[in-house]
A protein has these predicted regions:
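Conserved small/polar residues in nucleotide/adenosyl-binding loops
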Residues: 286-292
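Generic structural signal for well-ordered, non-membrane alpha-helical segments
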Residues: 31, 47-54, 58, 160, ...
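Short glycine/threonine-rich loop-to-helix capping motif typified by GTGT followed
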Residues: 232-238, 269-281
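A general structural detector for well-ordered alpha-helical segments in enzyme core domains, enriched
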Residues: 57, 61, 206-209, 239-246, ...
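Glycine-rich beta-strand-to-loop/alpha-helix junction loops that act as flexible
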Residues: 227, 260-269
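N-terminal capping/small domains of soluble enzymes
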Residues: 2-137
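Active-site-proximal beta-alpha core segment in soluble small-molecule metabolic enzymes
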Residues: 74-259
Length: 293
């Protein structure tokens, strides 16, 4: 009779996995690291970061996009931006930077990290710095400070007109802007974020009425964020196509826009039953065609 917990695992999941396995003595290992040793040393629950996996995943996603681009003769480029709010630990960010990546920030605190990384010689002025999140007065102050320092590829993603007016007149240097689209929420999603960003039909007027005539501001990016992350659902692809329609309309009146920033990212493995075809989803992106306006 099978009545052990290990029997339930065997019947429910494919085990061992790429990450987890057990020894003959029944010890649980994560990538050959004995977890019981860590539990005895640090107590439970505990959380740790496995640094080699960070670089491995970044290189994987770069390969998937390069492969998909080659398949469709796409001449654009893919730039991976690490979102600092996912982990502010120095050793995590430094591991990511070993892979020629860029950074996305969400608060004034994050820009202190950017400044420190630059002062330590770990982050060049040519890196893309995508400033997302709600812009407090302090956040705006630090954005201007980095622009004055010479961060030539810092992009400020605007959520609303208020943020535009906070930036206006703050520096004589060029300010590169992005606009966040307020995507429609997935039906019955428990947390609503559509209040963040600018509605589809207001984006072109927002550019033409406010940004277009500012001599030191240029629109470079459209930011698309879905809170579920990148999923193979009709809802997700429908929202992305709507975003591409807006991008095409913007491109028709704004020759400086050249980037589509995809937020949310790929889902990560949080349980043994996780199944997601990353390579397929990457290729699916390149099957989408930009509308002709």
């Amino acid at each position: 009779m099978k009545n052990k917990y290990s029997d339930l695992i065997d019947q429910t999941f494919h085990f061992p996995t790429e990450e987890f396995k057990t020894t003959e003595e029944g010890e649980l290992l994560y990538r050959d690291i004995p977890l019981m040793d860590l539990a005895k040393k640090y107590g439970t629950p505990f959380r740790f970061s496995y640094l080699p996996k960070i670089s491995e995943n970044i290189q994987k996603v770069k390969f998937w996009f390069a492969d998909a681009f080659a398949e469709h003769n796409y001449n654009g480029s893919y730039n991976y931006c690490y979102c600092t709010k996912s982990s502010h630990y120095k050793y995590v960010i430094e591991e990511g930077l070993k892979n020629d990546i860029h950074l996305e920030t969400s608060s004034a605190f994050d820009l202190d990290l950017i400044k420190k990384l630059h002062n330590e010689g770990l982050l060049g002025l040519d890196r893309f710095i995508v400033c997302n999140g709600f812009k407090t007065d302090l956040y705006i102050d630090k954005i201007i400070e980095l622009i004055e320092m010479g961060f030539e590829n810092l992009h400020v993603v605007l959520d609303n007109t208020r943020e535009f007016h906070l930036l206006k007149g703050r520096t004589e240097k060029k300010i590169k802007l992005g606009i966040r689209i307020a995507a429609e929420e997935e039906p019955k999603f428990e947390f609503y974020t559509s209040r963040l960003g600018i509605g589809y039909r207001y984006i072109v007027p927002f550019y033409e009425d406010l940004i277009k005539n500012e001599p030191n501001m240029e629109l470079k990016m459209l930011h698309f964020f879905i809170n579920t992350g990148i999923r193979d659902t009709a809802y997700y692809w429908n929202e992305l196509r709507k975003c591409l329609n807006v991008y095409a309309k913007l491109k028709a009146v704004c020759d400086t826009i050249d980037s589509l920033n995809i937020g949310g990212g790929f889902p990560i493995k949080r349980n043994l039953n996780f199944n997601y075809d990353y390579a397929y989803m990457t290729v699916s992106y390149t099957h989408l065609t930009l509308p002709t306006i």
